[in-house]
Structures are given as C-alpha cells and as structure tokens.
Amino acid sequence: MAMSDRLDLVNPSEIRKLFDIAAGMKDVISLGIGEPDFDTPQHIKEYAKEALDMGLTHYGPNIGLPELREAIAEKLKKQNNIEADPNKEIMVLVGANQAFLMGLSAFLKDGEEVLIPTPAFVSYAPAVILAGGKPVEVPTYEENEFRLNVDELKKYVTEKTKALIINSPCNPTGSVLKKKDLEEIADFAVEHDLIVISDEVYEHFIYDDVKHYSIASLDGMFERTITVNGFSKTFAMTGWRLGFVAAPSWIIEKMVKFQMYNATCPVTFIQYAAAKALRDERSWKAVEEMRKEYDRRRKLVWKRLNEMGLPTVKPKGAFYIFPRIKDTGLTSKEFSELMLMEAKVAVVPGSAFGKAGEGYVRISYATAYEKLEEAMDRMEKVLREKKLT
C-alpha cells in the first residue's frame, strides 16, 4: 500500500478537533490538551540564548549533538538504570512523537501487527498504519486501574504480531505499571520475540509513593526495546520540540536514515540548552515543584468528580484523570459536547483513545488550580440541571 493510501486511513485527532472548536468560543475552560501550563524554567531559556550567542545556528549531526546524547546517557543510567552507548544507542528527535513512526519503520513489514493497550495515546495507531502495519487494540480495565494485563495480551497475539507499545505513566488514564507488570510483559515479549516501544514521557509525574520503572532496565530487554522520552513534559518545553530514544544500534541506524531525509536534524541551539538542563540541579528542582502542584490538582479533581457522581480511579501518574460517564446514559462524545456547549468546559471523549475508552472522558489537570475549581463547579451544575447523576 502506498503512503498516500495509508494517509487516507488516518483521521485527524479528535483532541485537535475539540481544541479547534473550543478556541472559537468565549469563556471556555479547556481541560482537553495535554500540555503543562507552566513556563519553561528561566535558566533553560538562558541556555538557549547562550547557544544563539555562541553561533549554534547551523546544522548538527542527524543523530543529535554529542553533548546532548552524552547527557541523556548519564540521565538514563542514573534515573532509569539503563546502560546505553551515546554514540550508537541514543538518538535525538524533533519531539518524542517522531519516535513512533520512525521506530516502527525501522523494523515493521507491511501487514505485521502491533499490540496497543487501550485506552491509548492517539498517535500510536496512526503511526502503525503509516509504517505499513496493523494496530491491534488490547483493552485495559478500570477494575485493574487500567494497567495492562498479560492475560489480555495472550488473547490478541498472533504469528503476525511484531511489536507492543506500552505507556507508563499512561495518557489518558494516569495508570502506572508496577515492576511485576513489567516483568510479566517482558517475559511475554521474549516468548513471542516482540519489539517493545516504551513511552515514558511522563516518568517524573508520579504520585502516592509510586515508583517508575523502565522495561529496558530488565535483564535481556534493552536489545528489544525502544525507550521513548523527551523534554516537553519534563521541563515544560512543548513548543521547543525535542525528544530522544534509546534503542539497540541497528534500530538507531535505521531511524537516523529516516531523520536524515525528513527533519535532517533537531534544532542545534535547543539541543545545547537541553544538554545543559539535564545536568543542572535547578531543572530537577523545577520538575519536583511541578509534580507537587500537579498532585495538588489531581487530588482536587479526583475528589470533585467522585462527589458529582462520576466514578473515577485515582490516577497514579501523568496529569490526566479518566472519569466514568456511563451512568449518565450519554456516549463519551455526547458528554463532551454537552460539557463544551452547556458548561463551557472542554474535555476529551474517551472514544478518541480506542474502543476501551468509550464510557469515559479524559480530563487534563495541567491547568491552574482556580480554573479547575471553576470547571468542576460548571460541570457539576450541568449534571445536576440535566439530572444525569
């Protein structure tokens, strides 16, 4: 199938559609887009200015600046217990989102299947389709905190299955995989000879004394894992567009070819700033301050949603919460439209994240505390007036 045909199979993100509608309305509180409301820490901006003054305005290596790859290797070893060679097992990208299409294109053949636990981030399935593969949804359930269960994976694996995508902490559910979960997933991947793409962009935003574990740190897993991460969420740098992957050298080699004829290279002065940021304690202090504030907001939204009659699992990570709206009698799309038009609150229908997301909506609490309070008041008022809970 030609790429043009594959593009016809991919639909625009439901999240973006909602965002575009909300942007044309007045007095809307958007709890839709998953973006930190914090500004990039000032010292990171200063590093970027420093790089510009140094003349770092030219092309860099396709694989990324050596200084940044070395800083990433240090971070992976210290924080994730992953040993990766910065010269051939780490690559810098123009945003972490690039990793899915580029990574899948490194090994996936036409018609091969990729298991995607759902509800899932909206970019996964389109990336599989554009790479020539077939996305296979594997449902996760509220009763298990939306954590992936290997017993479910066993129901969907076939001879055509080539890879598995995992996301912990998870967008949209906020679930966090336990070490035991990852060990079972790793055994499953080895048994079926699968490549694992592990999306860990929310790793620093975890709560209730939960710990983050990287599947690539487990014995025998680095050689079959593409670890995806970035700077957008960690340091509130979404507009800077910078991500990275750690993977076996044969995968990195192919991804570099993709980047060579696509973006060429990530922005040079931004890479300089990111390398400095990773080694600056002020950056990690800022991350912890953001985490604490997200936690405060999480507790507020979780409490209010349950009080207004929308049963909600308490998320352990990221900055999303996934309330159940089935008892209202509305579909997730109908519920989202009602909240946008009547309450002027933008939330994302769970159906945007796969079949398992129907009956839920995603709320981002990466929004000022006072706005969240107002949004909860508005939502509760509409639910009471319409007698939906």
Curated annotation (Swiss-Prot):
GO terms for cellular component: cytoplasm. Its EC number is 2.6.1.1. It catalyses: L-aspartate + 2-oxoglutarate = oxaloacetate + L-glutamate. GO terms for biological process: amino acid metabolic process; biosynthetic process. The modification N6-(pyridoxal phosphate)lysine is found at residue 233. InterPro entries: Aminotransferase_I/II_large, AspAT/PAT-like, NHTrfase_class1_PyrdxlP-BS, PyrdxlP-dep_Trfase, PyrdxlP-dep_Trfase_major, PyrdxlP-dep_Trfase_small. It is found in: Cytoplasm. GO terms for molecular function: L-aspartate:2-oxoglutarate aminotransferase activity; pyridoxal phosphate binding. Its main location: cytoplasm. Its cofactor is pyridoxal 5'-phosphate. SUPFAM superfamilies: PLP-dependent transferases. Keywords: Aminotransferase, Cytoplasm, Pyridoxal phosphate, Transferase. L-aspartate binds at residues 34, 171, 362. It comes from the Archaea. The keyword Transferase applies. Pfam families: Aminotran_1_2. Belongs to the class-I pyridoxal-phosphate-dependent aminotransferase family. Homodimer. This is Aspartate aminotransferase. It comes from Pyrococcus abyssi (strain GE5 / Orsay).
